[in-house]
Design a protein with these regions (language model features):
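Generic hydrophobic, aliphatic-rich segments that mediate packing or membrane embedding
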Residues: 16, 39-43, 224
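Hydrophobic/aromatic pocket-lining and membrane-interface residues
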Residues: 20, 43-47, 228
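Short polybasic amphipathic segments
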Residues: 1, 18-20, 79-82
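A eukaryote-biased signal for short, well-structured alpha-helical docking elements
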Residues: 1-16
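Acidic/polar, glycine-enriched structural segments that form the non-catalytic walls/loops
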Residues: 28-29, 35-42, 48-218
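Generic cytosolic/nucleocytoplasmic N-terminal low-complexity/intrinsically disordered segments
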Residues: 11, 47-48
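Alpha-helical support elements that line or immediately flank enzyme active sites
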Residues: 218-228
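Low-complexity, acidic Ser/Thr/Pro/Gly-rich terminal tails and inter-domain linkers that flank the onset
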Residues: 12-37
Length: 228
């Protein structure tokens, strides 16, 4: 049984993307997340047989992170969890899974593949999307907008976008850009502005920058936002 908690783990945050990787003597498991839209993300997980012999793999997902009072309903290849107190709708779709089921009103169990044989050097790719819409937003419209997107293409476009932005940032003539310690600060500033950006929602009519995750819960600071 492949238990992630017992294996070597690395976690990386790149501009616009999260990566987690787990390794043991038989398998490499890499999962990546990037944004499709301002309301939806794609999650791509790849398991590779690193050994010299076939490996049997059963691939399951379990989760229990939703509100206990959520209203759960099934959709094509997924589940919808609506939180009654504010009508927030979280939709998770497992595009490559065999079986998806709710467990109570706050959990799920997904059978991706059972007893799948993975030959030496071969890979299996799991794909899912997560969408969060707020009160008054059209969930069906958002799901339709991402339904035809190719997950691999989205990750390729994400990489191209951020590589182009970083190249543009570092292409100036400033003497400071010749020193790696300043180049790193510049890239970190870009990553912070990206991470702290918030799209319009509720009483906030325009996108802007949330100044910090620590000690500041909601809202936007205008003197940060004009820079974005």
């Amino acid at each position: 049984q492949y238990r992630m908690v017992y294996n070597v783990q690395t976690t990386r945050y790149l501009p616009g993307k999260l990566i987690q990787e787990y390794n043991d003597e038989n398998l490499n498991f890499t999962t990546e997340l990037c944004y499709l839209t301002s309301r939806s993300v794609a999650i791509r997980s790849i398991v590779k047989n690193m050994s010299q012999k076939p490996v049997k793999v059963s691939f399951d997902w379990n989760g229990g992170v939703y509100e206990p009072t959520s209203v759960v309903s099934s959709i094509d290849k997924g589940l919808s969890f609506i939180r009654p107190k504010d009508s927030t709708n979280t939709v998770i779709r497992f595009l490559t899974a065999d079986k998806i089921q709710a467990v109570g009103s706050d959990s799920l169990h997904v059978t991706e593949k059972s007893e799948m044989t993975l030959e030496p050097g071969k890979t299996y790719q799991s794909e899912m999307t997560q969408t969060l819409t707020l009160r008054g937003e059209d969930t069906a419209k958002e799901l339709a907008a991402i339904a035809t997107l190719n997950i691999d293409n989205c990750f390729e476009l994400n990489e191209q976008q951020w590589n182009a932005q970083i190249a543009s940032l570092l292409s100036g003539n400033s003497k400071y850009l010749k020193d790696n310690k300043y180049r790193k600060v510049l890239v970190k500033a870009m990553m912070t502005l990206n991470s702290n950006y918030r799209t319009p929602a509720g009483d906030i009519l325009h996108g802007g920058s949330n100044p910090s995750y620590n000690g500041f819960i909601n809202g936007i600071w205008s003197w940060d936002s004009w820079k974005i």
